[in-house]
Amino acid sequence: MVTAVAAKEEPVTSFAKDQLRAIIERIERLEEEKKTISDDIRDVYAEAKGNGYDVKALRTIVRMRKQDANERQEQETILETYMHALGML
């Protein structure tokens, strides 16, 4: 026998379950897309390496291009200062 309280909670519970399932499925789909994109990026780096490019330098350039110009300049200045202090420049 279903009580009145249980009958009222059933649609809410069903909605919550459906919503939770949809969220989980979206996350799983996005994780798969992320893996595919990651594999594609790895392939591009492998291609670049095959063409004679230095992958480490390419990764550094990509990381630097993501930075704000002022932040990048500040990091370069600090690096130069340290290198100069160590007699590397």
Curated annotation (Swiss-Prot):
MF GO annotations: DNA binding
Disulfide bonds, paired cysteine numbers: none
A Pfam family that the UniProt record links to this protein: GapR_DNA-bd
Superkingdom in the source lineage: Bacteria
HAMAP family cross-referenced by the UniProt entry: UPF0335 (MF_00797)
Family stated for the protein in its record: Belongs to the UPF0335 family.
Name of the featured protein: UPF0335 protein Nwi_0989
Source organism per UniProt: Nitrobacter winogradskyi (strain ATCC 25391 / DSM 10237 / CIP 104748 / NCIMB 11846 / Nb-255)
